Design a protein with these regions (language model features):
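Positively charged, helix-rich recognition surfaces that bind polyanionic ligands
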Residues: 101-104, 116-337
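N-terminal cap/recognition module
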Residues: 1-5
Length: 337
């Protein structure tokens, strides 16, 4: 059964025979269709062995999202302080001036309303004119991503690991305490003690807000790092195709690897490069950037992960990550993202 046939069955057979499910019709019709399409895509990817079995989404347990699309000129109208959403009507925006308004001639094609940690967000697809001109005349750079430092650039700039900062460590300790408190409330509730359900929901919201705050700090750091790199206007940027899935199998490194958000960095860097007319090169994951001497091109096969300084028989001595960044910059075998 395809997503289209499921939608026909839902409207013509299931809802008429189940009056208690009539609330589905109260929702914006395109939002229901989009949910069915997403479910169809998820199952298709599962049967093609491209992803795991789809997770069941439920209000209160998952991040709820609502999709809307512009069917006529009166839909999806945006002003500086408010946005008109089909079915919901006018909704005030807390952060004013971020979305291009209809008065300025911009057209909103579609959007998504989502909720995270008791906060509502809207993201919109807007058609904008492409007026930017590429002026990337500087030398290309290579970026080596790692765990000790988040990113080492071949121009000498190093971006520290934000997860080692005192602020994030404090928040992670606070998160552990709140998670333990939530677990105790669930245990007491199962034993039939006097812990109220409302208190569990309050504690759950505390945990969600801490998760969201930590995630926002990491995402903000990635955005600022990419913006600073792109401002140097290199002619090209070379990164390595990291085997993150393989790195996650190491139980000693999995948490540190996940918190670095390497894939998000790559996706956002690719979008920024496309926006500014830069070429993003991706070196093969088997390219020995860390083990190759930048001076004589000799490969040290005995180099260990604990060796932070690269020493070659030719006398070349350099920081391991900086040496890898230089090799990535000069890599001749790559794919353009």
């Amino acid at each position: 059964m395809t997503g289209k046939s499921f939608s026909v069955w839902l409207n013509n057979e299931y809802i008429p025979n189940n009056p208690d499910k009539a609330w589905i019709k109260e929702v914006y019709s395109k939002a229901v269709k989009r949910s069915i399409e997403d479910g169809c895509t998820a199952f298709t990817r599962f049967f093609k062995h491209q992803s795991d079995f789809p997770k069941f989404k439920k209000k209160g347990k998952s991040d709820v999202k609502m999709y809307f699309v512009r069917n006529n000129p009166k839909d999806c109208v945006c002003e500086r302080h408010r946005l008109k959403i089909p079915t919901l009507g006018w909704v005030r925006i807390k952060e004013k001036g971020y979305i291009p308004t209809t008065k300025d001639g911009y057209v909103i094609k579609s959007g998504t309303v989502s909720i995270k940690a008791d906060r509502y967000y809207v993201s919109v697809l807007v058609e904008l004119p492409d007026n930017k001109t590429a002026d990337n005349s500087n030398e290309g750079i290579g970026i080596d991503l790692g765990l000790k430092d988040f990113a080492t650039v071949s121009n000498g700039k190093t971006y520290k690991n934000i997860n080692k900062s005192a602020k994030l460590k404090k928040l992670e300790k606070q998160l552990i305490r709140e998670q333990r408190s939530l677990s105790r409330k669930y245990e007491n509730s199962q034993k039939g003690e006097s812990t109220q359900r409302a208190n569990i929901q309050k504690q759950k919201l505390k945990v969600q807000k801490l998760h969201h705050r930590i995630d926002n700090i990491r995402t903000d750091y990635i955005n600022k790092t990419i913006a600073e790199i792109v401002k140097t206007k290199p002619s090209y940027i070379t990164i390595e195709d990291l085997n993150v899935k393989g790195m996650m199998k190491n139980r000693h490194l999995s948490k540190a690897v996940a918190s670095q958000k390497f894939y998000e960095f790559r996706i956002k860097l690719q979008a920024k490069c496309n926006e500014n007319g830069m070429e993003l090169r991706v070196a093969n994951r088997w390219y020995p950037s860390s083990k190759t001497c930048h001076c004589c091109k000799n490969i040290r096969k005995d180099l260990k992960l604990s060796d932070r300084i690269f020493k070659c028989a030719c006398g070349y001595i350099e920081d391991r990550d900086f040496n890898a960044a230089l090799n990535l910059r000069d890599a001749m075998t790559y794919e353009v993202a």
